[in-house]
Amino acid sequence: MDFLKQVSIEIYPEGASDEERKSYSKKYGAQMHTLLDAIRRQRQEREFSQQRNGSGKECFEEKSVRDSMMSGYESGQGKLWIVDNGIRAQELLEQGCPVLAWLHEDNRNQDFSGVRYACKNINELDFDYLEKVYRRYVDIPWEILTTKRCLVRETCVEDLDALYEIYADPSVTKYTEGLYPERAKEEAYLKDYTENMYYFYNYGVWTICDRATGQVIGRAGFSNREGYEDPELGFVIGVPWQRQG
C-alpha cells in the first residue's frame, strides 16, 4: 500500500522582486505542473493495477503499519514537500516535515543542510521514488516484493522477537550465521545495518511476512561477501513454514 497521499511543490526565489518572481515562476512552473500531473496519473494507474490483480486488499502486515502511522502523525500525515529554497527547507525540517530539495541553476549557493534527498531534474521523478523518500523520513520499511501469500520488506526492530524464535532452531543456523545472543547488540547492529545498507545501497537482507497473519516467517535478500564482487542471494525460512511450496 502507499503511504504518500500528497506532494506539495514550492518554488520561491530568495530576495527577488515581484517581476523576478513572475519570471522565476514562468521558468520553473511548467516543470512543477508536469510532475504533479505525472504523479497523479501514476498513482491512479497503481491503484487500478492493484484492484485488477487483487493486491489492493490490505494484508494484516500493511494494516498494522497503517494503523500505527495514523496514530503517530496528525495534519502532516502522508505529505512530502519538494522545495527549491534553502530557508524554506529548514523551516519544514524543523517542523518534522519530509523534504526533497529541487536543485537548479538559480539556487546553487543556497544551504540545504539536513535535507536527505535532492534532485536536479524533477521531471525524472516518479511516484514510486517519492513514496520511498517519504517512507525514509517517517521510518516506514520499504516493501520489496508482494506475492499471493508473502510480503517481503525491510527489517525493523519489531521483527526481532520473531527472528530470535526462528533462529533458535539448530537447523536454521546449521549453514547460516545466527543473531547476537544479546538483544541490545542485535538492535544496535540492525540500526547500523539500516543506515549503511538500506539507506546507502537500497538493498540487503529483508524480512518475509505471511500476508494473511502478519507473522514474520523468515528472511531473504542479498549480502556483500568479502572477496566477492557480486552480492550473494540467500534466504532463511522458519521451520514451521518450510515445505509449503
Model-derived features: where do they sit?
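Asp-based phosphoryl-transfer active-site loop
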Residues: 4-13
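Acidic, Mg2+-coordinating phosphoryl-transfer loop and its flanking beta/alpha structural elements
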Residues: 81-113
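Short acidic-hydrophobic, aromatic-tinged amphipathic segments that line or gate anion-handling sites
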Residues: 117-121
